[in-house]
Amino acid sequence: MILVIDVGNSHTVTGLYDHGKLIGHWRLKTDRDRTSDELAIRYHGLFIMEGIDPRQITDIVLASVVPTLSSAWIRCCERHFGKHLNQPVMDLSVTKLAPLVRVETDNPHEVGIDRLVNAYGAWHTRKTDLIVIDFGTAITFDCVTSDCVYIGGVILPGIAISLDALATRTAKLPMVDVRDVPSSLIGKNTVHAMQSGILYGYGAMVDGIVEGIQKEMLGGKRRAEVIATGGMANLIEPFTTTIEHIDKLLTLDAMELILHALKKKQ
């Protein structure tokens, strides 16, 4: 079995694959102070509850945007799974992905590994020009060409960051739950107005950025396909006109694909 670990700023998502099939996945809050032993206890418990024998894990792929947790995860995996692994933990990086994705940016090593993983995963299944939107702690727009060249993207504050800023940087605005979708754009009370502002506002922002990228990326000659992923993708998609597909498991599936693709190139 293959364990993939996607360590994000807010959440860590793990998935377990058996012969190409996702048999379990878990989403937990990222705690930057966790030790390798604490991580092992936490996830060993999840495996046991699902009836999964962790000794059957033969490969582990790690993609982390939290450097302090990368080393803890590697120590955890090496200590608690190492004797059963076919190879050391595959810790993904720009350099590691170089055989699969060409990065044409000013500073390639600044690009978050999750963005390149998503770019490759989306490209692998479609083989066309793509805009990949990830609704995470930050919202990222990533542009990849039909020959799998990553040419850059856009980063803006995520929905949770904006909600937190409204509640903490103002005297009277409350923290609101945007999963309660407003029935109209014009708010009749403060909570309604804030919900509308976030949902309709982010929807319009997504559409505006996508249209701008379409013009700049391909010069209007053809349109890139637009794919969304991340925890808030389903929430924002109804307020946009440009998102064509949602793939909630894009990152996990891409990491499993990358393991096999890199093994073939060894």
From Swiss-Prot:
Location(s) in or outside the cell: Cytoplasm
InterPro entries according to UniProt: ATPase_NBD, Type_III_PanK
Binding residue positions for K(+): 134
Cofactor: NH4(+); K(+)
Pathway: Cofactor biosynthesis; coenzyme A biosynthesis; CoA from (R)-pantothenate: step 1/5
GO annotation, biological process: coenzyme A biosynthetic process
Binding note for cofactor: A monovalent cation. Ammonium or potassium.
Organism superkingdom: Bacteria
Binding annotation for ATP: 6-13, 137
UniProt keywords, alphabetically: ATP-binding, Coenzyme A biosynthesis, Cytoplasm, Kinase, Metal-binding, Nucleotide-binding, Potassium, Transferase
GO molecular function terms noted in the UniProt entry: ATP binding; metal ion binding; pantothenate kinase activity
Chain residues that bind substrate: 112-115, 190
Active site: 114
EC number(s) per entry: 2.7.1.33
Recorded GO CC terms: cytoplasm
Catalytic activity: (R)-pantothenate + ATP = (R)-4'-phosphopantothenate + ADP + H(+)
Pfam family for this entry, one: Pan_kinase
Main location per the UniProt record: cytoplasm
Functional note: Catalyzes the phosphorylation of pantothenate (Pan), the first step in CoA biosynthesis.
PANTHER family: TYPE III PANTOTHENATE KINASE
Family of this protein: Belongs to the type III pantothenate kinase family.
Subunit structure: Homodimer.
Name of the protein this chain belongs to: Type III pantothenate kinase
Record lineage: Bacteria, Pseudomonadati, Thermodesulfobacteriota, Desulfobulbia, Desulfobulbales
